[in-house]
UniProtKB/Swiss-Prot annotation:
Keywords, sorted A to Z: Amino-acid biosynthesis, Branched-chain amino acid biosynthesis, Cytoplasm, Leucine biosynthesis, Magnesium, Manganese, Metal-binding, NAD, Oxidoreductase
Record organism: Listeria innocua serovar 6a (strain ATCC BAA-680 / CLIP 11262)
Name recorded for this polypeptide: 3-isopropylmalate dehydrogenase
Purpose: Catalyzes the oxidation of 3-carboxy-2-hydroxy-4-methylpentanoate (3-isopropylmalate) to 3-carboxy-4-methyl-2-oxopentanoate. The product decarboxylates to 4-methyl-2 oxopentanoate.
Assigned EC number: 1.1.1.85
Lineage per the UniProt record: Bacteria, Bacillati, Bacillota, Bacilli, Bacillales
UniProt subunit comment: Homodimer.
GO cellular component: cytosol
Compartments, record wording: Cytoplasm
Cofactor note: Binds 1 Mg(2+) or Mn(2+) ion per subunit.
Site feature (Important for catalysis) residues: Y139, K185
């Protein structure tokens, strides 16, 4: 079977880490006899440079026709004053594809627990997932207005928006440790009262999965105090934006973590959580781990290639345990050397 993948390398370190991700895909294809049809297109700043638009029509069409999309990174000071910014392309892509659920796994490999800003005994064995709603809430609510006297933002959520994201969280929890933590502010916000009510309704359809509720301030505190108590966290757009970024620093480096964004139907988008890091671009020092892990997520969640994804995850773990660490992890391994070691581990693994 052939899998169609649209590659959006983007800007800054994006092309370097995308090259790593594609090499990993090629190794998996060779070892397990798969065909990955990879089509590259300009996006973000590269799209502006190539076609005057962060998401040129050809790029959007390729994304819509793909089985999955890989994104490197976008943005940079070069386009700060452009009429359309690179980030506008990502918002447009999310809207065009109907991407409503952002999935961010948080894990701390034993080889880098010493890099976490938290104590080793706190972060050891951390393994949870943040599920963030992407299409509703304060970021998209109307009316929205500001002037010198006052400003208005509107927080709106519909039953459909809430129910589908909470169902997604329960779906993920069913494959993990069967616990969902729903995060809201139901003691203050009307939208959170509806959120909590619907969470209970969804939970009643999944009796084998435990549901707990936390106010967002308590969740933010517990994520630092006892991160190992979480399995799947689900929350609305603004809270998810903040909590997922808070969770990301537990590992000690943004270069470690992947993310996925899913629609109800159609292709999903996989990308590292970090930015384009233009200050280290083209120096062969970027950590490709988050891109490689994004490839693993894609194989697992879009293509159901679980054995192949496990092979990638095991290879990256062995690579780091052997001391191959990039600069952000306190080492001096280059982007290409790290990638080559992972390739070696994939080829030599079971």
């Amino acid at each position: 079977m052939a899998y169609k993948i649209t590659s959006l390398a983007g800007d800054g370190i994006g092309p370097e880490i995308m090259a790593s991700g594609i090499k990993i895909l090629e190794a998996i294809a060779a070892k397990y006899n798969h065909t990955f049809e990879i089509e590259s297109h300009p996006f973000g700043g590269a799209g502006i440079d190539a076609a005057g638009d962060p998401i040129p029509p050809e790029t959007l069409k390729a994304c819509q026709n793909a089985d999955a999309i890989l994104l490197g990174a976008i943005g940079g000071p070069k386009w700060d004053n452009a009429p359309k910014r690179p980030e506008d392309g990502l918002l447009a892509l999310r809207k065009a594809l109907g991407l409503f659920a952002n999935i961010r796994p948080i894990q701390v490999p034993s080889s880098i627990t010493h890099l976490s800003p938290l104590k080793k005994e706190i972060v050891e064995n951390t393994d949870f997932v943040v599920v963030r709603e992407l299409t509703g809430g304060l970021y998209f609510g109307e009316p929205k207005h500001w002037d010198d006297v006052a400003a208005v933002d509107s927080l709106t959520y519909t039953r459909v928006e809430i129910e589908r994201i909470i169902e997604k969280a329960f779906e993920i929890a069913s494959t993990r440790n069967k616990k969902v933590t729903s995060v809201d502010k139901a003691n203050v916000l009307a939208s959170s009262k509806l959120w909590r009510k619907i969470a209970e309704e969804v939970a009643s359809r999944h009796p084998d999965i435990t549901l707990e509720h936390l106010y967002v301030d308590a969740a933010a505190m517990l994520m630092i105090q006892r991160p190992t108590t979480f399995d799947v966290i689900v929350t609305e757009n603004l809270f998810g934006d903040i909590l997922s970024d808070e969770a990301s620093v537990i590992t000690g480096s943004l270069g470690m973590l992947p993310s996925a964004s899913h629609a109800e139907n159609g292709p999903s988008l996989y990308e590292p959580i970090h930015g384009s890091a233009p200050d280290i671009a083209n120096q062969n020092i970027a950590n490709p781990m988050s891109m490689i892990s994004s490839v693993s997520m894609m194989l697992r969640q879009s293509f159901s290639l679980f054995k192949e994804a496990d092979a990638i995850d095991a290879a990256t773990a062995r690579t780091m345990q052997a001391g191959f660490l990039t600069a952000d992890l306190g080492g001096n391994t280059s982007t290409t050397d790290f990638t080559n070691e992972v390739l070696k581990q994939i080829e030599g693994g079971e």
